[in-house]
Structure formats: structure tokens, C-alpha cells
Amino acid sequence: MKNKKFKRVLVVLGGTSGERAVSLNSGKACIKALIKKKYLVSTFDPKFKNLNLIDKRKIDVIFNALHGKDGEDGVAQSYFEYLNIPYTHSGVISSYNAMNKLVSKDLFIKNKILTPKFYSVHRAEKKNYNLKKILIKKKLHFPLVIKPINQGSSLG
């Protein structure tokens, strides 16, 4: 952020996702770096306050250090855009597409980008979930990666 017209920076960190600890660490590192570069830094943690309490009159730009659900999936970005506040991060649609593994997978396949075989288990199927049958039916084999559809930071 070399543009000094963005002097007052709000670092949004923490949140309520399973990646809260990662977000807090990222946010703290950002705060330290911004202060060192002489930016006026304030913080906001959506775990304790709703995003609608952001006072846009007191900030020039939002540094989005949220990780996971609501931070990387387009939710926070859409609210920042609603407030008409510039922010760091990809936009709403890009964030959603990147965070949702099924959407990403579909985009890769449609654009002929090589990607490993996969199988998605939906909540309704969990009762009857039989890994051995799925492996045989889908011709999958170990090693496997099992992850939630919309979390990052290697949670899963």
C-alpha cells in the first residue's frame, strides 16, 4: 500500500470461522507492518461486533485479514463494497469461486485445467456414507484429501 491517500487503515481480523487463530496471527502481522510504515491503524473483530458497525468516516481502506467462512468467500467483500470502502482482497465473485471447492473444480474442468478426481459427500448422504464403496465406484485410491467444501488453511 504505497498510496498514502489511504492513510487510515482498518484491519479486519479474527471472525468466527474455524480459521480464527490463523486470521488473528495474520492480522497482527499486518498491523505491525502497517504501523512500521506509519499508517494510522485501527482494528475490527467481527466476533465481537457486527460488520455493520464499521464507521466508514474514520477509515480510508480496509485490510481484510479474515480467513475462511465470511472472510474469504465474498461475504465480507460484499459488505465492504456496500459501504463503498476500498479493501484488500479479491472481489466478491472471485472470492466465492475460489473458496468453494465444488465451484472451483467445475471452473477448472470447464476450462480444461487438469485437476485430480474427486467426490463430494453432501450432508444428507453422511448417514449412508461408505468410504470403501465410494472408492470402488469412483475409482479413487489412497492417498486421499478430505476437506470441507468452503474452508481453507488446510482444515479438513
Regions found by a protein language model. Name each.
Residues 16-29, 33:
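Glycine- and acidic-residue-enriched helix-capping/strand-helix junction motifs
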Residues 34-35, 80, 108:
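Hydrophobic alpha-helical packing residues
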Residues 37, 83, 111:
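Conserved dinucleotide-binding and phosphotransfer motif residues
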Residues 36-42:
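A generic structural motif
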Residues 42-56:
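Eukaryote-biased intrinsically disordered, low-complexity acidic regions enriched in Ser/Thr/Pro
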Residues 1-13, 25, 41, 56, ...:
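Active-site nucleotide/adenylate-binding loops and adjacent lid/helix of ATP-dependent enzymes
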Residues 6, 15-19, 58-99, 114-123:
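A short, GP-enriched loop/loop-strand-helix hinge that lies immediately N-terminal to
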Residues 26-30, 76, 104:
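Hydrophobic residues within alpha-helices
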